[in-house]
Amino acid sequence: MKPQIYHVDAFTGDPFRGNSAGVVLHADTLSDAQMQLIARELRHSETAFLLKSEESDVRIRYFTPTVEVPICGHATVAAHYVRATVLGLGNTTVWQTSLAGRHRVEIHAEHNDYRITLEQGQPSFEPPLVGEIRAAIITALNLTEDDIVPGAPIQVASTGHAKVMILLKPDVDIDALSPNLAALTAISQQIGCNGFFPFQIRPGKNETDGRMFSPAIGIVEDPVTGNANGPMGAWLVHHGLMAHDGKTLQIQGHQGRALGKEGTVDVTVTIRDNQPENVTISGQAVILFHAEWAITF
């Protein structure tokens, strides 16, 4: 069967919002080079290629327009939304394998639609970025030290695909950020992390607003990022920066407003001994169109 290509908006229930992803079904016959060419042609921040797997229900590979990445939150939501729709799934648990490992995905059938919940990887944190590197990140984002929440480190956090966490004061106009992309690319090469996630907490709410810049891997700005909002939740627990009941923390991560692509990632962090133990992200999706690949490689 020829590969089937879907254009999906993830982390939204409305078309033309959220984060668009390519989803390619029946990708088993495609080579690495062909997958990269397709991802480059589709020009989504990530395209997910679904393949058969002997150890899971499905294997997924993820490509930006320029490089393969371990995993991608919004493309995972998009991929399982398409798969559930095509197969007519009900409420079920699916296991997927990717370069980031083996993860559980929950398919929730609701109101003749689906909500997808992805269990992310174990939260991890690198030492805070300090001194010249910290200053360079702040400068590259066209911010000042006064824009950063006092006592909040600038730090790489990961639940599978690492991002740099930068917590801004609530009065910073996050939509007005205009980073120096060349500088961010150079910093990425220095620190070994390609995503920068400045965000802020809405006062008195378990809600955040963020933006994610990743020019080093061909993504100027990602509209709505599961692999940023998930580790963000873990990072907030790790540093005691958002109140919780000691068992779970639930956050609505808002993103994409500056691009006119608003979307929401529902983040749940399970907690043990006041530290993050497990992270899930959840969201909706919309299929805009699908097509069959017409050419033969």
From Swiss-Prot:
Q: Which GO terms describe its molecular function?
A: isomerase activity
Top-level taxon of the source organism: Bacteria
Q: Respond yes or no to whether keyword Isomerase is given for this record.
A: yes
Q: Which InterPro entries match?
A: Phenazine_PhzF-like (IPR003719)
- Name the active site residues: 46
Q: Name one Pfam family in it.
A: PhzC-PhzF
* CC per GO annotation: cytoplasm
Has the keyword Transferase been applied to this entry? Answer: no
Q: Which Gene3D superfamilies match?
A: Diaminopimelate Epimerase, Chain A, domain 1
Question: Which Enzyme Commission numbers does its entry carry?
Answer: 5.1.-.-
The protein's UniProt keywords, in alphabetical order, are: Isomerase
Q: Which cysteines are joined by disulfide bonds?
A: none
* GO biological process: one example: biosynthetic process
Query: How does this polypeptide assemble, per the annotation?
Result: Homodimer and homotetramer.
* Similarity comment text for this entry: Belongs to the PhzF family.
Q: What is this protein called?
A: Uncharacterized isomerase YddE
Name of the encoding gene:
yddE
